[in-house]
Structure formats: structure tokens, C-alpha cells
Amino acid sequence: MQNNQFPHFSDEVGDRNMHNPYASGSSYDALFPPCAKLPYHGVELQPSAVCPKNFVIFDQTYDRSQVMYHPELTHKLMNTPSLNNLASTFQNEYVGGSYGNYGNYEQEVSSSYQEDPNEIDALLSADEDYEENDDNEGEEDGGDSEEVSTARTSSRDYGNTTAESCCSSYGYNNNNNNNSRKQSLSGSASSSNNDGKGRKKMKKMMGVLRRIVPGGEQMNTACVLDEAVQYLKSLKIEAQKLGVGHFSNQS
């Protein structure tokens, strides 16, 4: 018993129609009567003898859409108003909707991930004002900085990452980086009270991180943040080795 298989279309069997251009309206003059008008807009009609007689195939690609059918179904299709509605729906919802709104979708996604420029400015300005406010912060802490910084050592190696390797991996030079950052941020200071409070809070947080992270006082903001993450991971591993607490695999 012979197995029923789907027939190959003309662009798959390698015949003379394989490299022909897509059919246009003039290709159907021999199939449709002179008074017949094609009811489809934006969808190409593709009659083919290799199509099954009981199938009407809607094919959609990136740049075109077509309806393929057996030539004997031509007159039946022309007398079927519901097919016209189906083709219009296919064109509007799938062709226009899928590809016409692709750019709008990208724009919506990108707009949902916008960063707060005030927070970025506060982080960038932490390096600029760190040296000026370091002495004042030490006096306000009342000696607490000595207790916080007991674990600090510039030569400590954790997670195969040292303070020197962190700064070198970012390609930063502290002196050149501070000078260039001062120039880029000279006109970006905010005059509002809310921005001033946010900058002060951010600088205080970075000051604490610099005292906690080994070698943090010799790093810029980006290196301090990266080293803080690595340092916390190393502390988590050490605590797990000692059997202290129950930690989940979250970082």
C-alpha cells in the first residue's frame, strides 16, 4: 500500500518554475474571466497543479504573503465571499500586525528599561568628592571606621580576583579617570534639594563600601561596586564551609 505524502511545490522540485519571479496580476489572465476582479489586497494568488484539490494554503514570509491552490478551484474561490474576508483578516492581523508593529515593539521594550540619570550622576560624582569628604566622614563616624575596616587588606585575594586585577580589568587609571570624570561632570550638578540629598546618600554609601571592601580606598566607584559583589560571594562561600546558616544559591 502506497503511503500518502504531501506533494512538493513548484519551488521545491527544481523544475523550470523554480527561479521564476513571483506571480503578478498578469499571470492570471488565462485563469480568470476578463470581468473578474481580484478581491485580495496585499496577498498574492498562486495557483499550482501540484497543490491538492481539497486544500487552500495560506503562506506567509517576511516580505510577502500568498494563497496557493489547485487551478480547478479558481472559479469556486472567486464565488466565495468568505475567502475574501479570510484573506483580508490574514493580511491585516498577521502580515501588518507581525511585521508592521515590530519597530514599535522594540521601542516599547527599550523605553521600559530606562535608567535614572540622577542615580547615575550620583554614582559618578562619588569619585569626584570622595577625597574632599573623606576626613569629614571619618569625624562623623566617631572612630567607627576603624571597626568597619578591620577586614581590609589590599593584598587579599578572594574568588581569584584582587583589587589590582579588578581595576586593570576595567582599564581604569585612578588619576586620569578622576580628571576626565571631573571634566565630564562639571556642568551636570543638580540644583534641586532632592538631587542633593540623593547625592549625599550615595556618597555616604560608597564611603562605607570603600571601608568594607579590601583595598576599596584605592579604587574608583565601578571597581568598588564590583569588588563588593565578589567580596560578598567569598564571604558566603567561607560561611558555607564553616556550616554557618543556610544560604540559597542567589547572588
UniProtKB/Swiss-Prot annotation:
Chain intervals for the UniProt region annotation (Disordered): 1-20, 130-161, 173-202
Compositional bias (Basic and acidic residues): 9-18
SUPFAM superfamilies: HLH, helix-loop-helix DNA-binding domain
Domain named bHLH: residues: 186-235
Biased composition (Low complexity): 173-192
An annotated GO BP: regulation of DNA-templated transcription
Biased composition (Polar residues): 148-161
Listed name of the protein: Transcription factor bHLH144
Upper taxonomic lineage: Eukaryota, Viridiplantae, Streptophyta, Embryophyta, Tracheophyta
Gene: BHLH144
